[in-house]
């Protein structure tokens, strides 16, 4: 299976950079020259500066309108670089990594996603977006809500990562984001690494594409891992991967249409009874009742790893909270703006023009 990672903006570029570290094809797009220079693993010729004529390489200061315009203006250059990267070999999935709360990512990702769908109709376009932390304030929340709306109309799936679930209580924001970015890559890379790999029951690219072709709805990744010697109940470990503690987004499991589960570990631990017991529970709980599964016994392994992908999700408390907060703020902002404009008009009404005050006076000198 061939996947290309495209990082848009600061957050997306950092995530794509980690994907590049673990040997994925990756490219970074940004309005900030400094952010592109900060990257460590993506080759220089795979770093694209956009919007230079608009912001001069200094970024868009979390303004998605500028991010959108930068992507639109330089879209031919971006697509030319991507086309060169694709070459003559088909791409199964384009993963667009970005931060929902930023400017370049939030504004530019929907523009690029639409262009990719038109240029590569047989490839999936999947957004991987990090939801803003609550500590970041209202502006990132507004950006996230609007971007969710726009992306849902153009991508196949949105894998949303709720940073509030992954952040540890004693971390500051910068520490949290660095660890979260590595966590995102580790989990998704673990899943992709098992596609088209021989196993007792295998997952292939068509399985993954079927699950992710979900009409712009949400998807989430679940994960559970334990030392093989400490696994007393394999079924419980598998169930943990798709329950709230293992998922990256607060979702209603019952609203999911599709599921995909990959299990990797020593053969003596991967007992069929435990596996099917857990998968039967997942099948009963999700609305779509369709589960794709892969079992990968490996005598070299000393741990058991379970990666779960749920898609076709339309109910998520994480998403609902962001959208409701954004709507509330938008109403309050528009009301305050209208009241302010009304007070300004009232205050300034009745003032004369210069011509009224100075009419008839002769100029001196």
From Swiss-Prot:
Q: Name the Gene Ontology biological process terms.
A: cell division; microtubule-based process; regulation of cell shape
Quote the Pfam families the UniProt record gives: CetZ_C, Tubulin
Matches recorded under SMART domains: Tubulin
Coiled coil feature spans: none
Any idea where this protein resides? Answer: Cytoplasm
Q: Which InterPro entries match?
A: CetZ, CetZ_C, FtsZ/CetZ, Tubulin/FtsZ_GTPase_sf, Tubulin_CS, Tubulin_FtsZ_GTPase
Q: Which GO terms describe its molecular function?
A: GTP binding; GTPase activity
Q: Give the family, as the similarity comment puts it.
A: Belongs to the CetZ family.
The source's superkingdom equals: Archaea
| Span of the signal peptide | none
Q: Which of UniProt's keywords are assigned here? A: Cell shape, Cytoplasm, GTP-binding, Nucleotide-binding
Binding, GTP? 10-14, 103-105, 136, 163, 181
Briefly state the protein's biological role: Involved in cell shape control.
Name recorded for this polypeptide: Tubulin-like protein CetZ
Q: What is the lineage of its organism?
A: Archaea, Methanobacteriati, Methanobacteriota, Thermococci, Thermococcales
Q: Does the keyword Transmembrane apply?
A: no
Disulfide bonding pattern of the chain: none
Query: Principal place where this protein is found?
Result: cytoplasm
Give the record's GO CC terms: cell division site; cytoplasm; microtubule
Q: Which organism is it from?
A: Pyrococcus abyssi (strain GE5 / Orsay)
Q: Which Gene3D superfamilies match?
A: Tubulin/FtsZ, GTPase domain
């Amino acid at each position: 299976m061939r996947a290309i990672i495209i990082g848009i903006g600061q957050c997306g570029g950092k995530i794509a950079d980690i994907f590049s570290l673990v040997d994925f094809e990756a490219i970074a797009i940004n309005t900030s020259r400094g952010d592109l220079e900060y990257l460590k693993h993506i080759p220089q010729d795979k770093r694209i500066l956009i919007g230079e004529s608009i912001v001069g390489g200094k970024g868009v200061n979390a303004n998605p309108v500028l991010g959108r315009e930068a992507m639109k203006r330089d879209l031919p250059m971006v697509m030319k670089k991507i086309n060169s990267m694709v070459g003559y070999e088909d791409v199964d999935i384009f993963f667009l990594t970005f931060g929902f709360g930023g400017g370049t990512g939030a504004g530019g990702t929907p523009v690029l996603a639409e262009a990719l769908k038109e240029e590569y109709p047989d490839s999936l376009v999947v957004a991987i977006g990090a939801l803003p932390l609550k500590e970041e304030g209202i502006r990132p929340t507004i950006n996230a809500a609007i971007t969710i709306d726009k992306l849902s109309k153009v991508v196949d799936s949105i894998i949303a990562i709720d940073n509030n679930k992954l952040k540890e209580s004693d971390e500051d924001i910068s520490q949290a984001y660095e660890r979260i970015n590595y966590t995102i890559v580790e989990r998704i890379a673990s899943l992709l690494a098992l596609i088209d790999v021989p196993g007792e029951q295998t997952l292939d690219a068509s399985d993954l594409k079927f699950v992710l072709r979900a009409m712009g709805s949400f998807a989430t990744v679940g994960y559970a891992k334990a030392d093989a010697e400490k696994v007393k109940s394999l079924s419980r470990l598998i169930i943990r991967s798709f329950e709230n503690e293992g998922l990256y987004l607060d979702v209603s499991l019952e609203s999911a249409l599709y599921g995909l589960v990959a299990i990797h570990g020593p053969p003596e631990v991967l007992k069929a009874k435990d596996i099917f017991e857990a998968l039967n529970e997942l099948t009963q709980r999700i609305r779509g009742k369709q589960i794709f599964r892969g079992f990968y016994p490996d005598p070299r392994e000393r741990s058991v790893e379970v990666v779960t992908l749920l898609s076709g999700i339309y109910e998520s408390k994480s998403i609902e909270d962001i959208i409701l907060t954004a709507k509330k703020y938008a109403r309050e902002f528009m009301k305050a703006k209208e009241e302010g404009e009304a007070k300004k008009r009232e205050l300034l009404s009745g003032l004369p023009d210069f011509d009224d005050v100075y009419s008839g006076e002769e100029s001196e000198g």
